[in-house]
């Protein structure tokens, strides 16, 4: 479980490249993995111009007329890929006040004989080149480079936990399953449905293996919850990615690495600078890295050295994690990724998979119950 941290660690990626500084980097990474579950990585090997272009073109896409964005709405895709209209997504806590476009890697569609969760694989929907020139080229390039970085970072995570370097990367599978999700959050003054203090996205833990988030602008909206239940801000750091552990990595390590609850809160002060000047909408680019969806929980569990397990702030976290997640990941990993898509994008689910919506609702309710049970045990409620 997350410790009583009061700030989010910032790690310098170049320090991982030098033999003289790598040991200190790995020690900092290990501490962040075990005690916080959230950290920022400064100066990743992704060109700054590419980062800026991806944010700029994402903003241009969201500025398109609504009817133009709806041409590629996700309800047209059984893979859930495409534009998600404002206020149409949800977490267990309710409606999320955001709009987004979900993009996948450039992979072919699989046949109907494959398991239903593999229907998530296939081509993305893209705005036409005239509407947002360069959008597809830049976002595909960013997706490719952040994915390559995430694979390299999985090796660093294994090394920080003193496991063989390929312990985690061999679970990722080929082709790699991932999602890039450019997202826009409007200030409350621009969203009639949202009040000051509404959730851009409600408190949740990512179902992914790892998440790599590029924050645009200097908005102060992202918050992480510590063991005491206090919300700790994640201020944007120029040239840094926000990295957080997903539930999959917590399962894989038996609770040694901690998936931390976080949210995006929409308060007026988060959308203004120090002089009170409006910063406009918040643009972010989360990248979600998954393991091979065909694997089961038994396939992915790894042996973390005992002396690393001993670093967990409260040893009960190890045993609780296995019990807690067995109720969510009781089939293959892909089944649960698919259920998460159904509950996050209910309009898509009702169109393409109406017979599965009841199961998805039951899974979401069970997830929420277990979350509340665990939080009560930790003293959050």
Swiss-Prot record:
Cofactor binding, note field: Binds 1 Fe(2+) ion per subunit.
Enzyme class: oxidoreductase
GO biological process: small molecule biosynthetic process
Documented EC number(s): 1.14.-.-
Keywords: Dioxygenase, Iron, Metal-binding, Oxidoreductase, Virulence
Entry-linked InterPro entries: DIOX_N, IPNS-like_FE2OG_OXY, IPNS-like_sf, Oxoglu/Fe-dep_dioxygenase_dom
Cofactor(s) needed for function: Fe(2+)
Known pathway: Mycotoxin biosynthesis
Pfam families hit by this protein: 2OG-FeII_Oxy (PF03171), DIOX_N (PF14226)
Molecular function terms, GO-annotated: dioxygenase activity; metal ion binding
Keyword Oxidoreductase carried by entry: yes
The organism's place on the tree of life at top rank: Eukaryota
Family: Belongs to the iron/ascorbate-dependent oxidoreductase family.
Reported function: 2-oxoglutarate-dependent dioxygenase; part of the gene cluster that mediates the biosynthesis of gramillins A and B, bicyclic lipopeptides that induce cell death in maize leaves but not in wheat leaves. The nonribosomal peptide synthetase GRA1 incorporates respectively a glutamic adic (Glu), a leucine (Leu), a serine (Ser), a hydroxyglutamine (HOGln), a 2-amino decanoic acid, and 2 cysteins (CysB and CysA). The biosynthesis of 2-amino decanoic acid incorporated in gramillins could be initiated by a fatty acid synthase composed of the alpha and beta subunits FGSG_00036 and FGSG_11656.
Protein name: 2-oxoglutarate-dependent dioxygenase FGSG_00048
UniProt organism field: Gibberella zeae (strain ATCC MYA-4620 / CBS 123657 / FGSC 9075 / NRRL 31084 / PH-1)
